[in-house]
């Protein structure tokens, strides 16, 4: 780890103490910072907070003391990405011209290991997992490793102290994290895709959302690489304006892109890389994710053997078209990460078999008409729950689906989907909505879905 002096003897307030908040606090202590930790939750019984307190860190829990920023001098405020910029502490810091920084930027500035960054509305976690596995396969030949970090669930600050210059960090970075980033320089940056109804409750406008995503490449240099989606032409034009890096493109359909999906192979302009039939992940969108992982991995030194070793065995990330089990001849898939319409539009066409779809969740004010053609082509029956059940039912009726079942909860939906299905069908849970009407997170929702399926299997 680089022993940078930027934060040495600086008074720093860490706001929001989730997993990354605690990890960056430990890192800042190593760098010689003087820390104050604050969270609106009571921290008296929080084991990690008390450990830091024992190391001399001031811990303030239960409220956000806005007046503290006026009473004392702070050199930086480190903001948890989930805390909005409308938060009173953040607004006061802005008023007082206290620099607001983020965990990724601090951690990456200390990294001895080169790093690549992946963002996007959908597909970034799967892409990161594929990339990490390919690069790890490549690096293990020389006794080194690739680490998947960031929004994927492992704070960057946790891994940076142990990663060497011969390792590689594969960073999943969200728009929430990127909004606060002013200076990162990934060797490779990639934007898998950008859709216009994602996280607008946080970013307020689509333009703000796009600009946050573009921060992943804005401060790269001319020796770096940027991987862009050739099929999203409007976004591509903005990316060309912003990036200083060498651009490579990928496409689902256009063979003029640097990497593309051919008739039988994933291909580049120079070669046929891998037979599509040998790739384990289902769905055209996962072929696209594979192209991004290939493009990144090639820049970082991996070869086709590394790529084939991973793509021929990797069966998917949890909650992302995750195969759960087979129930009496019916394959069951958990796609709880489908928190928006676009995610459902890539999940639903992923199977050749007839589908019984389970969908529904938080009502964000969107209509579901974009799903009508997919419902018509792929879905034989549908079970709906949550705040959006009636809106989704309207779309299902427009698609001509006859078996439309409306229930109140996911627990009720699972056995009804089984009843509507036949051997040879796929039961697909792809909600097309956020989880917060009935669940804490999409992970929580997906875990419950798997639990309900397993309960059904034991009956």
From Swiss-Prot:
Family annotation (InterPro entries): Mur-like_cat_sf (IPR036565), Mur_ligase_C (IPR004101), Mur_ligase_C_dom_sf (IPR036615), Mur_ligase_cen (IPR013221), MurD (IPR005762)
EC number annotated for this UniProt entry: 6.3.2.9
Residues bound to ATP: 120-126
Enzyme class label: ligase
NCBIfam families for the chain: murD
Function of the protein: Cell wall formation. Catalyzes the addition of glutamate to the nucleotide precursor UDP-N-acetylmuramoyl-L-alanine (UMA).
Official protein name in the record: UDP-N-acetylmuramoylalanine--D-glutamate ligase
Annotated organism of origin: Lactobacillus helveticus (strain DPC 4571)
Gene encoding the protein: murD
């Amino acid at each position: 780890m680089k022993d940078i002096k930027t934060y040495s003897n600086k008074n720093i307030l860490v706001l929001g103490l989730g997993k990354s908040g605690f990890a960056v606090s430990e890192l800042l202590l190593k760098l010689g910072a003087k820390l104050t930790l604050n969270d609106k939750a009571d921290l008296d019984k929080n084991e990690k907070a008390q450990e830091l307190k024992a190391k001399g860190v001031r811990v303030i829990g239960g409220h956000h003391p806005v007046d503290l920023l006026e009473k004392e001098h702070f050199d930086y405020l480190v903001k948890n990405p989930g805390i909005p910029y409308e938060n009173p502490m953040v607004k006061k810091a802005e008023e007082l011209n206290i620099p607001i920084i983020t965990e990724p930027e601090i951690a990456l500035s200390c990294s001895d290991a080169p790093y690549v960054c992946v963002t996007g509305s959908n597909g970034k976690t799967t892409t990161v997992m594929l990339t990490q596995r390919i690069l790890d396969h490549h690096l293990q030949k020389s006794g080194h490793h690739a680490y998947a970090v960031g929004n994927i669930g492992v704070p960057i600050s946790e891994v940076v102290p142990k990663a060497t210059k011969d390792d590689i960090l594969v960073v999943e970075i969200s728009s929430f994290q990127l909004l606060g980033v002013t200076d990162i320089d990934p060797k490779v940056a990639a934007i898998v895709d950008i859709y216009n109804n994602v996280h607008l409750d946080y970013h307020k406008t689509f333009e703000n959302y796009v600009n946050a995503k573009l921060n992943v490449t804005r401060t790269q240099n001319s020796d770096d690489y940027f991987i862009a989606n050739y099929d999203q032409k409007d976004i591509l034009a903005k990316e060309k304006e912003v990036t200083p890096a060498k651009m490579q493109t990928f496409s689902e359909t256009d063979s003029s892109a640097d990497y593309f999906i051919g008739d039988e192979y994933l291909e580049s302009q120079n070669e046929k890389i891998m037979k599509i039939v040998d790739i384990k992940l289902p769905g055209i969108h996962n072929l696209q994710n594979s192209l991004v992982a290939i493009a990144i991995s090639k820049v970082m030194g991996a070869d086709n053997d590394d790529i084939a070793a991973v793509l021929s065995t990797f069966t998917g990330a949890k909650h992302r078209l995750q195969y759960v089990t087979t129930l009496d001849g019916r394959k069951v898939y958990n796609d709880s990460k489908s928190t928006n319409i676009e995610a459902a539009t890539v999940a639903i066409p992923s199977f050749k078999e007839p589908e019984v779809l389970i969908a529904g969740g938080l009502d964000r004010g969107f209509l579901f008409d974009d799903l009508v053609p997919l419902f018509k082509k792929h879905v034989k029956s549908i079970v709906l729950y949550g705040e959006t059940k009636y809106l989704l039912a309207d779309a299902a009726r427009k698609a001509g689906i006859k078996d439309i079942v409306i229930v109140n909860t996911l627990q009720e939906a699972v056995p009804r989907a089984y009843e509507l299905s036949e051997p040879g069908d796929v039961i697909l849970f792809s909600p097309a909505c956020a989880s917060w009407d009935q669940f804490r997170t999409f992970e929580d929702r997906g875990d419950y879905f798997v639990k309900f399926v397993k309960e059904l299997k034991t009956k």
